[in-house]
Amino acid sequence: MDIRKTTNEISKKLEEWSKDKPKLIVAIDGYTGVGKTTLLDNLVKLNPDILPVNRDDFQISRTKFKKLYKNAEDRTHIFELEMNDSGKLKKLIQTFRKSSKPYKIKTYDGLSGKINIPKTYNLSKRVMVIEGIFMFHPKLLNKLWDKRVYLKGDIKQIDKRRIAREKKRWGKDYFPETHPDSYFRQVIIALKRYRKVYHPDKQADLVLHI
């Protein structure tokens, strides 16, 4: 299934799920690089009543992350459970449930590693769609979602595309994922454990192959 068909299918489901509901919160999970962000961008173009939320915007600062990473016994767990500010995201979700007023916060800056990008969320929208990894993890915010969508894809091809993209982005500064200290290596290990232990596809209300 291509991204356009996937977008249309999810859009129809959102209309169905949101019928007779004042507010709806939907989480989109899937392997890193499967196309969650692109899909959400396309959904917003199709449905103006969607409030898009990217989990990556809620990452902790790079300074805080490095302290956790340095002292961790198992660094993969940092990426799985502590990389994001779950309390901050939870507050946005809870406010969305009960308010329609603009909600202003500062989000993560991937370049500086600081929490300094101002962002305003339009809580008058009826459907909040949040995309990210580990979205259905029982130790995080899984219980807050009304509906769950899981995206499946060819992991080998996804990894191949991501590596090519990262090599192009970083050039001579590219850090191979096979290196023991590679951040992405830790993420991949955590993701594979998450899929094996918690079976996110089996928790989903809708599973799509893209």
Locations of the language-model features?
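Post-Walker A helix-loop "phosphate-sensing" segment adjacent to the P-loop in P-loop NTPases
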Residues: 45-53
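Hydrophobic positions on the alpha1 helix immediately C-terminal to the Walker A/P-loop
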Residues: 39
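Small-molecule kinase domains that catalyze NTP-dependent phosphoryl transfer to phosphate-bearing small molecules
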Residues: 168-210
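Conserved nucleotide-sensing/catalytic segment adjacent to the nucleotide-binding pocket
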Residues: 51, 60, 64-112
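ATP-dependent NMP and nucleoside kinases share a basic, alpha-helical "lid"
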Residues: 114-168
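Conserved glycine(s) of the Walker
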Residues: 35
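Extreme N-terminal, non-catalytic leader segments
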Residues: 1-25
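P-loop (Walker A) phosphate-binding loop of NTP-binding proteins
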Residues: 31
